[in-house]
């Protein structure tokens, strides 16, 4: 087995590119501690240096294989170890997936993301998803896959099939990873990210907040993302959706200002990445989402469902974008 470990940048290992900055955890904590208005203003300035502030990238996420996952992640309703009422389902037929991708494109999405509840795919699974990727790509959509830990050669196969992005989140602060996920390590995640980069795929990598972590631990998550070299092209920031039956069902609610701070700090530390408002938007007011856009979020998951949980309806998102004069990016613009 070859290990392609995507290393976190160390201060004395930086490549000689002036745009690259190493972020100490304490520096990220200092950003979190800025006065709220100053932090949002700074993030908005950084955002405008690299993006059109009126542009937003729309992704649609579909679970192509739901439930029965052998992993033990305390936040996830798809784990077979928790009784959440979710029924295990076989993989969707390619015809059904393509039809949903067509609908997503018609409604304005430029990227179609597909997730499967595996610890990692088997070689036979890669053959199936490669066919699916090719069919979705032929529609004129960007493609993204989240299929778990990859073995040698799998990332290359996905790249050859036409996959654009591979999603593999770091979930939480590396120092508390084992407290949240019990069947894999942070190093396992880093190894797959290394394989993905080695294959020439773009990286979608973010995390989840609201899992009873402290602010310094949120800073640790952002620092671990910002110090990936190169930085992820796409950074999804999820607010925990508490699902009955999971250990995180009783997690304490995260104050909304702390979530906006997280978006702002992600924008400042990863200035050229797309920062996506991901899970948890159903609990966010329009005003809160607007502040997130001002603070540098420029992507959302668009569609009524995220894997197994609810998402705002398309009509509501379209209305909000109209109110804010936001326009969706097309595939070639992303």
Swiss-Prot record:
Keywords: 2Fe-2S, 4Fe-4S, Biotin biosynthesis, Iron, Iron-sulfur, Metal-binding, S-adenosyl-L-methionine, Transferase. Its cofactor is [4Fe-4S] cluster; [2Fe-2S] cluster. It catalyses: (4R,5S)-dethiobiotin + (sulfur carrier)-SH + 2 reduced [2Fe-2S]-[ferredoxin] + 2 S-adenosyl-L-methionine = (sulfur carrier)-H + biotin + 2 5'-deoxyadenosine + 2 L-methionine + 2 oxidized [2Fe-2S]-[ferredoxin]. Binds 1 [4Fe-4S] cluster. The cluster is coordinated with 3 cysteines and an exchangeable S-adenosyl-L-methionine. GO terms for biological process: biotin biosynthetic process. Residues 54-281 form the Radical SAM core domain. Gene3D superfamilies: Aldolase class I. Belongs to the radical SAM superfamily. Biotin synthase family. Catalyzes the conversion of dethiobiotin (DTB) to biotin by the insertion of a sulfur atom into dethiobiotin via a radical-based mechanism. This is Biotin synthase. It comes from Haemophilus ducreyi (strain 35000HP / ATCC 700724). The lineage of its organism: Bacteria, Pseudomonadati, Pseudomonadota, Gammaproteobacteria, Pasteurellales. The gene is bioB.
């Amino acid at each position: 087995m070859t290990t392609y470990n995507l290393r976190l940048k160390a201060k004395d290992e930086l490549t000689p590119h002036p745009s690259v900055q190493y972020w100490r955890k304490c520096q990220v904590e200092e950003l979190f501690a800025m006065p709220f208005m100053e932090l949002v203003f700074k993030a908005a300035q950084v955002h405008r240096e690299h993006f059109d502030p009126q542009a937003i990238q729309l992704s649609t996420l579909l679970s192509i294989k739901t439930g029965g996952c052998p992993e033990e992640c305390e936040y996830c309703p798809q784990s077979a170890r928790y009784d959440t009422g979710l029924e295990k389902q076989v993989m969707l037929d390619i015809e059904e997936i393509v039809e949903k991708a067509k609908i997503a494109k018609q409604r304005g999405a430029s990227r179609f993301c597909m997730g499967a509840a595996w610890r990692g795919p088997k070689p036979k699974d890669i053959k199936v998803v490669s066919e699916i990727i090719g069919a979705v790509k032929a529609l004129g959509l960007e493609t993204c896959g989240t299929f778990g830990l990859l073995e040698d050669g799998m990332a290359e196969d996905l790249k050859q099939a036409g996959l654009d992005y591979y999603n593999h989140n770091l979930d939480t602060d590396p120092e508390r990873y084992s407290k949240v996920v019990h069947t894999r390590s942070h190093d396992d995640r880093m190894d797959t990210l290394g394989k993905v980069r080695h294959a020439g795929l773009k990286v979608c990598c973010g995390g989840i907040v609201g899992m009873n972590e402290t602010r310094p631990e949120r800073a640790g998550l952002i620092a671990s993302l910002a110090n990936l070299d190169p930085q992820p092209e796409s950074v999804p920031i999820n607010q925990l959706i508490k699902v009955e039956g999971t250990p995180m069902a009783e997690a304490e609610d995260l104050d909304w200002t702390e979530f906006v701070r997280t978006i702002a700090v992600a924008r400042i530390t990863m200035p050229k990445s797309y920062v996506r408002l991901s899970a948890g938007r159903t609990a966010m007011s329009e005003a809160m989402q607007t502040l997130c856009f001002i603070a540098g979020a420029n992507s959302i998951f668009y569609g009524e469902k995220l894997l197994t949980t609810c998402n705002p309806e398309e009509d509501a998102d379209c209305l909000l974008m109209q109110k804010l004069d936001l326009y969706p990016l097309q595939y070639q613009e992303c």
